[in-house]
Amino acid sequence: NTPLLASRRCGFPPADYANLITVGFGMLSIGIAESAMDAYATAARKSKGGAPSQAENQWVQMETGMLWTQLQAARLFAERVAWLADERSEEAMPAAAESKMLANEVAKQAAAEALRVGGGGSFLLSSPIQRIFRDAQAGALMAYSVPLTQQVVGEAVLAAD
């Protein structure tokens, strides 16, 4: 019972095919993390009042290196999930949950660091960082939430032989 024309209906996916929405959740958070990294780098490169930019500080460089590496790992994991789904592997759905969990945490961390480097101005409505920070928090709450996923993954790991 749908207004969609019969010629446009594609029916239900096969039972062995992964839930494609779940497969894409990790990529959503990766996009947020990439936006956070862009805002982070922009804020770090800004020079205020003739002072050197924060990009010259060792702690900022070290944090940038770790965030970048974590983002690359999360992206590779999400790409693997898409490949598993295309292969109709039974590992696709568990890997999708793990990928979402990792990507959400990377997005939240990158957004938090963007706030830290951006300073108080990051909380203003005119700053893209405040929106990115909210988006990162929301990603961790949408189904399946990070706490639930942590529990499910942890339970599976501890139950393994």
What are these regions (language model features)?
Residues 24, 38, 101-111, 124:
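Structured catalytic cores of enzymes that bind and process phosphorylated ligands/cofactors
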Residues 31, 65, 69-72, 97, ...:
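Generic structural signal for well-ordered, non-transmembrane alpha-helical segments
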Residues 42, 74-77, 108-109:
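Extended, amphipathic, non-transmembrane alpha-helical segments
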Residues 72-102, 115-123:
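C-terminal helix-coil-helix/basic helical segment that borders enzyme active sites and/or dimer interfaces
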Residues 26, 57, 64-67, 92, ...:
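Hydrophobic packing residues in well-ordered alpha-helices of helical domains and bundles
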Residues 48-54, 89-93, 126:
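Flexible, glycine/charged-enriched surface loops at secondary-structure junctions
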Residues 1-71:
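Glycine-rich beta->alpha junctions and the first turn(s) of the following alpha-helix
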Residues 120-161:
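Glycine-rich phosphate/cofactor-binding loops in nucleotide/flavin-utilizing enzymes
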